[in-house]
Amino acid sequence: MKKIFSLLLAASAFACTQEKVVEITINNPSATDRTNEITEITSDAVAKLKGETFVISDNTGSQVPYQITYDNKIIFPVSVKAGENVTYKIMPGTPEAFKTIACGKQYPERVDDVAWENDRIAFRTYGPALQATGEKAYGCDIWVKCVSEPIVDMRYKTELDPETRAKIAELRKTDPKAAQQLAESVSYHIDHGNGLDYYKVGPTLGAGTSALLVNDSIVYPYCYKNYQILDNGPLRFTVKLVYNPLTVKGNNNVIETRVISLDAGSQMNKFTITYDNLAEATPVVTGIVLHEPSEDYQADATKGYIAYADPADPVNGQIYVAAVFPEKINEAKAVTFSDKEKAERGADGHVLACSTYTPGSSYTYYSGAGWSKWGFENSGKWFDYVQKFAQNLKEPLTVTIK
């Protein structure tokens, strides 16, 4: 009798556990395998767990990492072959400790930079302390990397270490050569085996920044005014940036808010932009700076992307940049600066994607970069990646929750 009672208890416990299992079926409608692609579901999907901690497992029973985002989504990586389905399970349990892949922070010690990264690439944008110096840096910057672990924080700490900076300053008085050698040994502008910062932004749109267009002139944004980090790993970094008022068609109180997120495994940030107090529909452009005259770019409004290969550096290789648009854009083209503007901006022009911003709406697109020393040996490989990324946006993974 005791044995039967024990079996009944076990069966009851198993049934209760099964009642709390959430099955997530992912379907890949595209002709491309999707590997470790971050998928999201609403937190309502786990309501039956009644607040219990949970684990997510794949079809082999192995745990997969997940993150609960600021906007109450559960995100996790999925792998599913073209045209197939795969099922993941969510159930009560204690999740394993997973490595942080996507992360970032503000660096007040480096004129308020906000910098972020994942396992593929890193970026930064500029803050109010830089704007106060008068230096012109409008667009998004790229930091290339060739290691999967986070390295941006270490680069800043090494470059800006007060003791090292003081030693360099002293050496400059007595031994300029030694001072230079020490400065180079800690500089993030030199590759010490994990990548570097050698992309130039200046007074341009840099690596895929957007701006309003008035009478064919770009109303360049400057540095952010306020920032708020909304997500900080392990799988997604999200930052909200609010900018100083712009003057647009006589209105001097147009305020841009920019939300940027970067997921693990992706070369591309997601940008969501709004303009408050804008009175009427206004052209908006997303641009990639052309540092030199070049034909090594693609601009395809029909397929919804622009992509560009920056001039190759003989030591550091080549940086590739792109922007991809889930909604239809009006035009995609290269625009060359006038001679005067070339001199002012230190560049040849932009590859631009042109759209229209309607007041009260949001403008969403993806922009990012790759490096010839970390996965993209030539521009052809980069353009292939961008084309597939654009196509995958049109054929998103579908999610069924049971």
Q: What name fits each language-model region?
A:
Residues K73-V80, E327-K402:
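Beta-strand-rich recognition/accessory modules
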Residues K225, I229-D231, T238-V284:
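Acidic, contiguous internal or C-terminal segments within carbohydrate-active enzymes
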Residues E19-K105, R110-V111, K136-G139, V144-K145, ...:
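Alpha-mannosidase-like glycoside hydrolase catalytic domains involved in N-glycan trimming
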Residues K89, T94-D216:
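Solvent-exposed N-terminal domain segments of exported/luminal and surface proteins
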Residues M1-T25:
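Bacterial Sec-dependent N-terminal signal peptides
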Residues E19-V22, P283-T336:
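Polysaccharide-binding surfaces and accessory modules of carbohydrate-active proteins
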Residues E84-P95, V239-Y243, T286, A322-A323, ...:
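Short, hydrophobic/aromatic-enriched beta-strand segments in well-ordered soluble domains
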Residues G51-I74, T247-N251, E292-A307, A332-A343:
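Solvent-exposed beta-strand/loop surfaces of large extracellular or lumenal domains
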